[in-house]
Each structure stands twice: as C-alpha cells, then as structure tokens.
Amino acid sequence: MCSSDLHDYALLSKAANAVFLMTYEWGYVYGEPQAIAPLPQVRAVLDYALSVTAGENIFLGAPLYAYDWPLPYEKGRTRAETFSSQAAVARARLVGAEIEFDETARSPCYHYFDKMRREHVVWFEDARSLRAKIALAAEKGLQGIGFWQAGRELAQAWPLLDALLTLETL
C-alpha cells in the first residue's frame, strides 16, 4: 500500500533539508468518497517513510480542505466539490446535517440532500482530526506538521497548534 517505486524516501531525505510528506488525498476529487487523510493510512505512510529514513527532517502534511461528493458515486463520472473545512461546517449548519466523527479514520463527515434531493457526503478536517495528526507527528519524532492549502483556513487549527506546539516559521 505505501511502498512505492515512485519515491525514493531515503534519497530524498538525504538530499533535502526538510521533506513535506503528503499523507492526504486518499479521498480525492475523482475518487470514491472517503476521508481525505484517514489516520490508519497516514500512519502507514509514516511507518514506511521512517523505515527508510529518520524523522527529524520530515514534516507531516495535513489538509485544511473538504470534499463534497454527490451520491451515488460513479467511477469516472462523479466529481467532488472542493472547499475549506470551515465552509464544510457552515454547509452542515445550512442544510441541517449532523456532523459525525469516524473513529477509525479519525475524520469528520456528514450526509445531506441538496435541493434536487440528491444525496451528498462531505469529508473534511477539524480540530479533532488535526489533533490526532499532530499527536502522531509527535509520537513519531517528526520535525513538525505542515498544512496544505493554508488559504482555505480552518480557524480551529491555529489555537490548537498554539496550545500543543511551539510554532516556528520557516
């Protein structure tokens, strides 16, 4: 699952001062609906990377965005809408959806029906899912954590980081 001939982690680690490890996009725009960065898969990627290199120059990449898939999913046809995690929470409120938390993936999601009565599923990140990723980065002795698409901000991320970590601008 995580081993790949596409990336030589050991060589990349030696050649770079820091490596931003993309551990997300398990759920993606054209893919089947699922968590964007489910913790078991994130852990597996890290375990593989750490089996061939040390963690002191690795930053765990974490997403700050959401995907909204219309259902039923049709391979090659269904395309998820992308927006911020903050917008995902606002949409849940707007449509009256109950946000659930998948304990295995350690990611929030919800279902709703649009005006055309078509069902949707939304997966995103929140303080709980980010906290799990921050804890994993600390557990594995990584250099830190980095966010992808910081322009699609999640207001919960900054106080959480402030409380749990010493921030350093690179």
Feature annotation, model-predicted:
Residues S3, L64-A135, L165-L170:
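Glycan-binding loop/region signatures in secreted carbohydrate-active enzymes
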Residues E56-I58, H120, G141:
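A generic secondary-structure signal marking the coil-to-beta-strand transition
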Residues I36-R43, F124-R131, R152:
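Soluble non-cytosolic domains of exported or imported proteins
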Residues L130-L170:
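Acidic/aromatic/glycine-rich contiguous surface patches that form carbohydrate-binding/processing clefts
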Residues M1, N17, Q143:
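Conserved acidic residues
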Residues S4-L94:
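Substrate-binding surface in catalytic domains of secreted glycosidases
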